[in-house]
């Protein structure tokens, strides 16, 4: 039996940014804090027949990619924040790891190999997170209020005085937020503050379990005036979110290259990283290459993040989204940006899309697909079922933006092997630096095979089935 104090050679990182090594007997060891190429010892916390898990305890050979973390709350120490997992790895190396995760998932789960790799999309590693959900905890025994992310592998809130992945103004505001909550009458009934920042406005959504007193409302107003933030309140579910006081500037972000401004509410889905979102939108539009005479369908369109820029280039864009509320907001955004004439929107459950429904709603020259983590299985499956059907012409190109490499790989397998498309390109988007989250973009082009039925008896590779498994490390 191997000793927990054996020196191990770290081979790779898994999806949780843990180092992966093997003992002499072949057992896999997952090591938090270790990097590929390092020789380490591990303090084992869990043991199973085939694997072990633990924390880096000693380091004999250090990776050249190891860097000093940029936040004092990051690390393996007790009480460390669990919001980031990769601050000890050079940002360029983080991108390389995510690219490998994408390629491995496409191949192992979808049996798909892109014809070329896209240049990774990346940007500033700090101050990028314009959306965040911060937990709040009043600790009576210590007489303090904690505001921040949870501790690593814990339900407790980390004792944070700064957070460099948040906008600098918000990071610097954390101590003042703690003081504010500590002074409020309802301090033990305020579990969460959600950040939603736009180009000009920083909105904070306060979740409160009891009605706020007049005194507490006055404290919020004074804080907002001093720190330049807009308060929203959430007494119950997301549908109850409302402004503390009406008036003032509107929460919005812009896509300057396309002359688009997108008003939104704090509860609406918007990308965490606005700088990367601008680059991503431009990359997606250029890859889709809509022509002035073409019709585009934007699946999972949300507020119109891709719909409206595409409408600047194409004859018509039809956005489809599961939420009627978001569809209405997308219509309003299209009208506000002068794009109502060549955009249309519809609410539809895209997780139950049948081939017949796709036949009537999916006819277009090109598709933009931007699903949530669950992916677009029903859409990809129906596309495959329509292959060769009389009266159906599949889109010439599909650009698929993904926030889960496992479901992208599953759907890519259907699109390539059963629907008859080629995966001509794929690449990563580092939307969340210092985390293990992998965002990506893939491009599929219609081949001649997509226009004819799949040959009877043609063998298909064994593909990942619905629901998708966890991503491959």
Curated annotation (Swiss-Prot):
It catalyses: uridine(1939) in 23S rRNA + S-adenosyl-L-methionine = 5-methyluridine(1939) in 23S rRNA + S-adenosyl-L-homocysteine + H(+). It is an enzyme of class 2 (transferase). [4Fe-4S] cluster binds at residues 71, 81, 84, 163. S-adenosyl-L-methionine binds at residues 271, 300, 305, 321, 349, 370. GO terms for molecular function: 4 iron, 4 sulfur cluster binding; iron ion binding; RNA binding; rRNA (uridine-C5-)-methyltransferase activity. Keywords: 4Fe-4S, Iron, Iron-sulfur, Metal-binding, Methyltransferase, rRNA processing, S-adenosyl-L-methionine, Transferase. Its EC number is 2.1.1.190. Signal peptide: none annotated. InterPro entries: 23S_rRNA_MeTrfase_RlmD, MeTrfase_TrmA_CS, NA-bd_OB-fold, SAM-dependent_MTases_sf, TRAM_dom, U5_MeTrfase_fam. The active site is at 403 (nucleophile). Residues 1-58 form the TRAM domain. Catalyzes the formation of 5-methyl-uridine at position 1939 (m5U1939) in 23S rRNA. This is 23S rRNA (uracil(1939)-C(5))-methyltransferase RlmD. It comes from Rubrivivax gelatinosus (strain NBRC 100245 / IL144). The lineage of its organism: Bacteria, Pseudomonadati, Pseudomonadota, Betaproteobacteria, Burkholderiales. The gene is rlmD.
């Amino acid at each position: 039996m191997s000793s927990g104090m054996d020196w191990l050679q770290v081979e790779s990182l898994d999806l949780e940014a843990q180092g992966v090594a093997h003992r002499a007997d072949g057992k896999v060891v997952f090591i938090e804090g270790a990097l590929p190429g390092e020789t380490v010892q591990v303090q084992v916390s869990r043991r199973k027949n085939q694997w072990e898990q633990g924390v880096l305890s000693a380091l004999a050979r250090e990776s050249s990619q190891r860097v000093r973390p940029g936040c004092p709350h990051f690390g393996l120490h007790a009480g460390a924040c669990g919001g980031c997992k990769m601050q000890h790895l050079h940002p360029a190396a983080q991108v390389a790891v995510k690219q490998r995760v994408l390629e491995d998932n496409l191949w192992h789960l979808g049996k798909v190999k892109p014809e070329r790799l896209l240049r990774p999309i990346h940007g500033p590693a700090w101050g990028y997170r314009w959306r965040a959900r911060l937990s709040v905890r009043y600790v009576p025994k210590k007489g303090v209020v904690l505001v921040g992310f949870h501790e690593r592998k814990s339900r407790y809130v980390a004792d944070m005085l700064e957070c460099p992945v948040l906008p600098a103004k918000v990071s610097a505001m954390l101590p003042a937020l703690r003081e504010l909550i500590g002074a409020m009458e309802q301090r033990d009934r305020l579990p969460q503050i959600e950040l939603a920042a736009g180009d000009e406005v920083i909105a904070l959504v306060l979740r409160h379990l009891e009605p706020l007193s007049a005194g507490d409302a006055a404290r919020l107003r004074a804080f907002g005036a001093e720190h330049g933030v807009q308060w929203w309140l959430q007494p119950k579910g997301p549908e109850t979110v409302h402004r503390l006081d009406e008036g003032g500037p509107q929460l919005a972000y812009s896509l300057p290259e396309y002359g688009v401004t997108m008003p939104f509410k704090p509860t609406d889905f918007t990308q965490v990283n606005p700088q990367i979102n601008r680059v991503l939108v431009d990359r997606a539009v250029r890859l889709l290459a809509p022509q002035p005479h073409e019709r585009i369908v934007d699946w999972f369109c949300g507020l119109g993040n891709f719909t409206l820029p595409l409408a600047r280039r194409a004859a018509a864009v039809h956005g489809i989204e599961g939420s009627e509320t978001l569809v209405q907001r997308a219509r309003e955004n299209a009208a506000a940006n002068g794009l109502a004439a060549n955009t249309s929107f519809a609410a539809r459950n895209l997780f139950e899309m049948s081939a017949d429904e796709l036949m009537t709603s999916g006819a277009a020259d090109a598709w933009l697909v931007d699903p949530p983590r669950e992916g677009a299985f029903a859409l990809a499956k129906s596309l495959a079922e329509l292959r060769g059907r009389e009266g159906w012409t599949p889109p010439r190109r599909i650009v698929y933006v993904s926030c889960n490499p496992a479901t992208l790989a599953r759907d890519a397998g259907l699109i390539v092997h059963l629907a008859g498309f080629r995966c001509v390109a794929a690449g990563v988007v580092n939307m969340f630096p210092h985390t293990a989250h992998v965002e990506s973009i893939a491009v599929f082009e219609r081949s001649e095979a997509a226009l004819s039925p799949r040959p009877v008896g043609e063998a298909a590779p064994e593909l990942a089935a619905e629901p998708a498994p966890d991503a491959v490390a």
